[in-house]
Amino acid sequence: MQLKIQLLMLVLMTVLTGVLGKDGYVVHEDTNCKYSCDVFKKWKYCSPLCQKKGAETGYCYSFACWCVGLPEETLVYGDKGTYCWE
């Protein structure tokens, strides 16, 4: 019985992780560099940009756009093979 509960929890966690998506700094498609932003306008630029990339929302964090709830296939800074070419 306990094993069944553990398996059920594992399946639920896997499904929820896929549904919620991933978070990260979105990158320019041509350079793989982060989108820079003004930290004093935390949501104004980044939220629409992130939503255009498929995220739930986004905000300026450490002078770059951090997106929340991105689709798994969206490339973010730090993914394997993402290097800024600028």
From Swiss-Prot:
Residue ranges constituting the LCN-type CS-alpha/beta domain according to the UniProt record: 22-85
Instruction: Provide the transmembrane region boundaries.
Output: none
Q: What is known of its domains?
A: Has the structural arrangement of an alpha-helix connected to antiparallel beta-sheets by disulfide bonds (CS-alpha/beta).
Q: Which Pfam families match?
A: Toxin_3
- Tissue occurrence: Expressed by the venom gland.
Alphabetized UniProt keyword annotations:
Disulfide bond, Ion channel impairing toxin, Neurotoxin, Secreted, Signal, Toxin, Voltage-gated sodium channel impairing toxin
Annotated source species: Lychas mucronatus
Q: Which Gene3D superfamilies does the record associate with it?
A: Knottin, scorpion toxin-like
Descriptive protein name = Neurotoxin LmNaTx35.2
* Entry's localization field: Secreted
Checking InterPro entries in the record gives: LCN-type_CS_alpha_beta_dom, Scorpion_toxin-like, Scorpion_toxin-like_sf, Scorpion_toxinL, Scorpion_toxinL/defensin
Mostly located where? secreted
Where does the UniProt annotation place the signal sequence? Answer: 1-21
Q: Which PROSITE patterns match?
A: LCN_CSAB
Tell me, in a sentence or two, what this protein's role is: Binds voltage-independently at site-3 of voltage-gated sodium channels (Nav) and inhibits the inactivation of the activated channels, thereby blocking neuronal transmission.
